[in-house]
């Protein structure tokens, strides 16, 4: 993590208007049309796995949100997953380690929340394998998964101890369990 990060805080401590402004700056105001938004439509982000990065001047420079979603197998049975993202950093502060710090905070929180003798839920995201691979995300388990909108299959990445038990085929969408 960069020395630039002064503080990682729970995302729920940040004004939602500031979060939306940061996301617009990082991804553009048309970001709501992206497939990731369709996958998590109608869901509230998971506060225990969502964080904000403040720089040394206590300015908001990054956010990470996680969402409850499901992979529905061909028979329609839902399997719960956590969708990671967006991982957003303001453009002028990218490549300073803020995204890495946010990912590390989320994975640490996920490990603390894990139940004894039970694997944590698998995580999925749409992103660059070269970046997210350092945390074990891979496109290998998602080859038969589909999304409700356009996406590059090489960018649909997943990680988790229980991926072998996941359906090989299915559609990602909001958790409705």
Language model regions located:
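Short, solvent-exposed loop/turn elements at beta->coil junctions and helix N-caps
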Residues: 36-42, 143-146
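Conserved acetyl-CoA-binding loop-helix of GNAT-fold acetyltransferases
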Residues: 84, 89, 95-108
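Conserved active-site alpha-helix within GNAT-family acetyltransferase domains
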Residues: 116-117, 123-152
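Conserved beta-strand in the GNAT
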Residues: 50-52, 59-72, 80-88
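Non-DNA-binding regulatory cores of transcription-related proteins
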Residues: 141-159, 166-177
């Amino acid at each position: 993590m960069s020395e630039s990060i002064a503080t990682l805080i729970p995302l729920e401590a940040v004004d939602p208007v500031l979060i939306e402004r940061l996301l617009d700056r990082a991804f553009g105001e048309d970001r709501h049309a992206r497939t990731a938004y369709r996958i998590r439509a109608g869901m509230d982000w998971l506060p225990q796995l969502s964080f904000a990065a403040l720089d040394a001047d206590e300015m908001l420079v990054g956010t990470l949100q996680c969402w409850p979603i499901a992979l529905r197998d061909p028979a329609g049975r839902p399997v719960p997953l956590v969708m990671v993202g967006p991982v957003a950093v303001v453009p002028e502060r990218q490549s300073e380690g803020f995204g890495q710090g946010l990912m590390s905070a989320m994975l640490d929180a996920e490990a603390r929340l894990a139940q004894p003798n039970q694997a944590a839920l698998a995580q999925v995201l749409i992103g660059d394998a070269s970046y997210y691979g350092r945390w074990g995300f891979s496109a290998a388990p998602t080859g038969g998964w589909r999304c409700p909108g356009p996406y590059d299959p090489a960018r649909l990445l997943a990680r988790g101890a229980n991926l072998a038990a996941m359906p090989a085929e299915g559609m990602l969408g909001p958790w409705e369990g």
